[in-house]
């Protein structure tokens, strides 16, 4: 039986934390999120926080986006953003470096929903098949997204029809990721 998106995300998150611990002998550390509340925070120091992913008590669906654009969003999208809190995590997919986007807090979730709504409105204006971004790449004009129609995970050039299929679904994509931990 194939893994669910929720399980694949939990597995990758665990691999990420374990890789960080193996390299740094502590939980992941972040300097950019200092001062931003989150259930992920384990310890706060002057210029950094240590954190770990936290599974939500109850999974959520991002209905605000669906209502705002009048479009049903793919279940993999809801599962990816609605099951845990986490800082963004760096990874490698084949030879491509990515930063897997995550929800740090409920306030961050509101920001994500606004950004996703703007992304979908732009795609509608350009008459593009709707996609739902899940990661950024080294090239600021390329993002990794879920195709809302097929559920395939794709690399897309923002605002264009240039799309390359990376995986048949989000669980498969997450299973192929390798954590990348900065020195």
Swiss-Prot record:
InterPro entries: Syd (IPR009948), Syd_sf (IPR038228). Its main location: membrane. It is a peripheral membrane protein. Transmembrane segments: none annotated. One of its GO terms (cellular component) is cytoplasmic side of plasma membrane. Keywords: Cell inner membrane, Cell membrane, Membrane. Interacts with the SecY protein in vivo. May bind preferentially to an uncomplexed state of SecY, thus functioning either as a chelating agent for excess SecY in the cell or as a regulatory factor that negatively controls the translocase function. HAMAP family: Syd (MF_01104). NCBIfam families: PRK04968.1 (NF003439). Belongs to the Syd family. This is Protein Syd. It comes from Aliivibrio fischeri (strain MJ11) (Vibrio fischeri). The gene is syd.
């Amino acid at each position: 039986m194939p893994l669910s998106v929720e399980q694949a995300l939990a597995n990758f998150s665990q691999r990420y934390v374990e890789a960080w611990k193996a390299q740094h002998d502590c939980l992941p550390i972040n300097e950019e999120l200092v001062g931003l509340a989150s259930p992920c925070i384990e310890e706060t120091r002057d210029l950094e926080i240590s954190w770990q992913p936290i599974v939500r008590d109850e999974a959520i669906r991002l209905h605000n986006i669906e209502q705002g654009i009048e479009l049903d969003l793919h279940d993999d999208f809801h599962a990816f953003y609605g099951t845990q809190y986490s800082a963004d995590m760096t990874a490698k997919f084949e030879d491509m470096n990515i930063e897997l986007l995550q929800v740090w807090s409920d306030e961050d979730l509101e920001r994500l929903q606004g950004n996703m709504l703007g992304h979908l409105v732009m795609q509608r204006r350009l008459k593009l098949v709707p996609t739902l971004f899940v990661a950024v790449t080294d090239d600021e004009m390329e993002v990794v997204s879920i195709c809302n129609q097929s559920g395939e995970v794709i690399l897309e050039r923002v605002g264009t029809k240039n799309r390359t299929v990376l995986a048949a679904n989000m669980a498969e994509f997450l299973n192929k990721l390798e954590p990348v931990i900065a020195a």
